């Protein structure tokens, strides 16, 4: 990470910068997939979702603090300075991993390349990946355009929107930790209620978005629910892989991270189509809610599959 961000810092042109960012992005899926399984292995089985939620809380806190801090550094010291800062954080992260991650971790069963490809053929895992992609697709239909929604529809000033987004980020971190506790015992059942609640709040946001007070209340609830399912989804994927394809836990976890990013791309793209169509910005909440309706149906079918097994 240090060297890749350093390449961004010294990039002579746009193409080099983009290629360096792509190289940096390769580490994202690997880090979070392996990090999830390591976090889950460090605690008793009944606390695995909580451990995963704590790890992902670091991501949400980094987004809440890092985005405004990076913007500040870029505005005052230039965009290259932000990559220098990220490179330094990479060194700190490496040192922390070397010092804090135990060396005596139990090695899981190794899996052949053929068995790893079987992850994409496992019905239960496929539906878990679909839950991730559709659930976060619904989130990002709205989240991608949240700032213009709050300014153009709700009527907030840009400076106020920045503060509201900070509150939204805090709610995300809170929801992430809460999701870990709720999903510890039965992640699949917990996910059903999480997705249903998120869909209802997204639908409610369609009606409250024009009211400053009601929109803030709805946004706090939406923030708490936006990433609440992350720990449960990661735990579910790991549990299915452990049971049906031992040794492929890291691979399954990595594909789930990929599904998360695919969901972001789908949601953002769908939101863009809606915003530029006759439906407009105001329709993004109920379109996002439709994504969650589909996610709930997928989850119900996944519960049915688990009962058969």
Question: Where are the predicted features?
Answer:
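Helix-to-loop junctions at the C-terminal end of transmembrane segments
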Residues: 175-187
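Extracytoplasmic gate region of multi-pass secondary transporters
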Residues: 124-166
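C-terminal membrane-cytosol helix-exit motif in multi-pass small-molecule transporters
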Residues: 87-106, 298-299
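A late C-terminal transmembrane helix in Major Facilitator Superfamily
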Residues: 240-279
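Cytoplasmic helix-loop-helix junction between adjacent transmembrane helices
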Residues: 12-16, 20-58
